[in-house]
Design a protein with these regions (language model features):
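Surface-exposed, interaction-prone regions used to assemble/regulate multi-protein complexes
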Residues: 1-120
Length: 120
């Protein structure tokens, strides 16, 4: 897994078009402070081919999670958002700050973020 740094977030999200119209494939709670999700989306650097992307959240301090059986029902038309404001924050939907992210149906706030690309 590669670390995702705060300075690289904007380019990372642009590369995958915020996972708009992508797929929320899985969510796994490894421990109370470590969580993983798998998303599928189109990669701008690969001529918009579909890939899977695993995100690992370490040092989780707050979260609202969905039941894994309901992930296929998540509306991904707005994609996801990743921001950094002293901590990383992930949310399904268009949110631009930490307080708004907590309005999302699914969000995770953590200290460190890593990712791994794989085949669709």
């Amino acid at each position: 897994m590669k670390p995702l740094l705060a300075k690289d977030l904007a380019a990372f999200m642009q590369r995958f078009n915020n996972f708009k119209d992508g797929e929320f494939r899985s969510l796994e709670v490894i421990s109370p402070t470590i969580m993983k999700i798998i998303l599928a989306g189109q990669d701008e650097t690969r001529a918009f081919d579909w890939i899977s992307l695993e995100l690992e959240f370490n040092g989780v301090s707050d979260a609202r999670l969905l039941d894994s059986a309901k992930l296929h029902l998540v509306n991904m038309s707005e994609g996801i958002n990743l921001i950094y404001d002293r901590n990383f924050a992930f949310a399904v939907g268009e949110y631009n700050n930490l307080s708004n992210i907590k309005d999302s149906a699914c969000y995770i706030v953590c200290r460190d973020l890593k990712y791994k690309e794989s085949r669709f």
